[in-house]
Amino acid sequence: MSNSLIRIAPGALTIGKPLPWDVFDAEGNILLRQGYVIQTNSQLEQLFERGRFKPRKIERPKEEVFEDLRQRNPFAEYGDLLTTLEVTLNAITSEDPTAQKRLLGLCRMLDKTCQEAPDASLALVHLYSISPTIHEQILFYGILCHFIARQFGLEEKRATLLTAAALTANLALVPVADQLNASNKVLTDDQRAVIRKHPLRSIDALKSAGISNKLLLRIVAQHHEQADGSGYPEGLSGGEILPEAEILALSERYVAMITKRAYRNRMNITEARKLIATLADGKFRPAIPRSLLQVLGDHPP
């Protein structure tokens, strides 16, 4: 039986929710039964380190299509975009063979939405960023990366891979992010460990799902590195960091600025723009904060 078991991917389990299947160790010994409710971050950590599960085989018709070619309105399609994102991330964490096709289809869907309705897409970020869920935040990262990448001058293929990275880089944080954002307490050591490990855990989940594009994985790996070498997980600095990773980092930072958390209020857009303008001073490639400011304009949608 142990040969049929696979590792539990980051993002597959959530604190406070029942296990969707029995969990085994590497030798096939049962650790926890289906339905057990995970209570703590340390339990979640142990399951990611030791846990295995037996995947269910599901037959799918070959003609199933993942890309929708309809003209897009971001407000009308908001629910569909979030549902598609959640389904895609679940496909990755469950190592579904359709995961890569779903991710590419979602990237095309989001890029098409941004291309057809740029002002509405940016307005959606600003209107819905007051107290967003983790899935909403991830969607906002994808939207902002789309616009910054093109303003910065990335070629189309690299820009699409950046969108894919934006949608998956925080996969390993999905189980705990909403809980962390709603807490006004100091982070525990376990919580800090989850945060610092999430880039590499997200990469592990992508690889396990058959998503192995080297540039995509490098963007995910580097999106919390800092130009001064103080970032994680590798402590890279300066030109060692991909511009795509800096674009994703800035997108996440901007969404954090305009988002309310339990421990602080959100910035208004004018304040956020002023802070972004200071980030060209050694924290990012100067052209990247400038690109975001150009995307936003003097009066963002």
Language-model features, listed with the residues they occupy:
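Hydrophobic (often cysteine-bearing) scaffold residues that line and stabilize catalytic clefts
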Residues: 137-140, 198, 216, 285
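Alpha-helical scaffolds flanking conserved acidic
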Residues: 155-168, 215-219, 241-247
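Short acidic/histidine-centered micro-motifs embedded in hydrophobic/aromatic stretches
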Residues: 106, 127, 165, 198, ...
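Alpha-helix N-cap and coil->helix boundary residues
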Residues: 157-158, 175, 211, 215, ...
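Helix-turn-helix-type domain boundary/helix-start signal
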Residues: 36-37, 152, 185, 210, ...
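Divalent-cation-assisted or electrostatically stabilized phosphate/pyrophosphate-binding catalytic cores
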Residues: 183-204, 226-301
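Terminal helices and disordered tails flanking the catalytic cores of nucleotide-processing hydrolases
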Residues: 1-109, 265-301
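Acidic/His-rich, divalent-metal-binding segments that scaffold phosphate/diphosphate chemistry
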Residues: 63-196, 203-208
